[in-house]
């Protein structure tokens, strides 16, 4: 062989194989995780979701991740209460997203998504986290 696969991959001639959670986020791992806080109003979360063009957001309190909000939660809440935007996030948030480790396989990550679970958080090992969405998984398919 004239060129080995590692040399070709390093120079962009071969596609990287996406097999682990960190492979999915490597192109945007430097971006901060956008979160909402339980005591904030729902309107603040909506504003943040619009600003960053995201459809789901993890919710934190002083202890850590305690919930989540997505478009579906917001829509259902708005249908039943037109004043949803003025309520605290803790009153309408859903369950927290599962937290995975960097080495988790794509197959394992994919199994965590469901109608009720729109995202997964990945523990970066340095006290910070990142988010993986269904869109990220679909976008990683070559």
Where are each of the predicted segments found?
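Tandem CBS (Cystathionine beta-synthase) repeat/Bateman regulatory domains
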Residues: 1-142
């Amino acid at each position: 062989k004239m060129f080995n696969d590692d040399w070709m991959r390093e120079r962009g001639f071969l596609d990287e194989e996406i097999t682990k959670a960190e492979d999915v986020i490597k192109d945007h791992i430097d971006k901060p995780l956008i979160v909402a806080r339980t005591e904030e109003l729902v309107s603040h979360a909506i504003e943040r979701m619009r600003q960053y063009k995201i459809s789901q957001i993890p919710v934190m309190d002083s202890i850590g991740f305690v919930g989540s909000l997505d478009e579906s939660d917001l829509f259902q809440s708005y249908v039943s209460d037109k004043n949803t935007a003025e309520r605290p996030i803790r009153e309408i948030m859903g369950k927290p997203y599962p937290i995975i480790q960097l080495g988790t396989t794509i197959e394992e990550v994919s199994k965590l998504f469901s109608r009720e679970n729109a995202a997964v958080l990945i523990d970066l090992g340095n006290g910070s986290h990142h988010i993986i969405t269904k869109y990220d998984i679909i976008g990683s398919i070559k």
